[in-house]
Amino acid sequence: MDPRLVILSRGPGLYSTMRLTEESQRYGFITRVIDPMSISTTVDDDGGRIYHQGWPIQADAVIPRIGFSITRPGSGIVRQFERMGAIVHNTADAILLSRDKIAATQVMADCGLPVPKTISVASMEDCMQALRTIGSYPLVIKASEGTQGASVFLLDD
C-alpha cells in the first residue's frame, strides 16, 4: 500500500506546495493538499480523529506549512496528527517555538549553539537600558514574534 501524505497548506497553488506535491507523488506517496483551517478534529482517549469536509483523514506523514496568521489553530491540527501516529515533518512544538524568538534563542543557547547577546524588554524605557547594556553597534532589534524578517531593524548608531 502506498504511503499517504498530507500537506497542510492554505495555498495549494503556491509554487512550493506544488513542488512538494509533485516530488512526493514521484516517490510514490498518495498526496493530498488540505487547508488546515478546513479541518475538524475529535479528541478522545483513543487518539481522536481528523475530518475534512466530513470525511475522515488518514495520514502516514504530514508536512505542515503553517503561516504566522494561523499559528495557534494550525499547530493544534498538527498536534492532532501527531497524536494519531503520523510522522510530522515540523512538530506542533517546533512550529510554536519558531514563532517565539526569545524562546527559540534560549533553546539554541541551551543546546550549545552560539547566540548573540539577546535582551528582551517590556518597555521603551527598558529598551534604552538594554542599548546601554549591550554597549556596541551595530544592533539588531526584533519584535518578539513574527516571521520572514517582519519587524526586524538594524541600528548602526
Predicted regions mapped to residue ranges:
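Active-site nucleotide/adenylate-binding loops and adjacent lid/helix of ATP-dependent enzymes
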Residues: 2-10, 20-22, 57, 81-85, ...
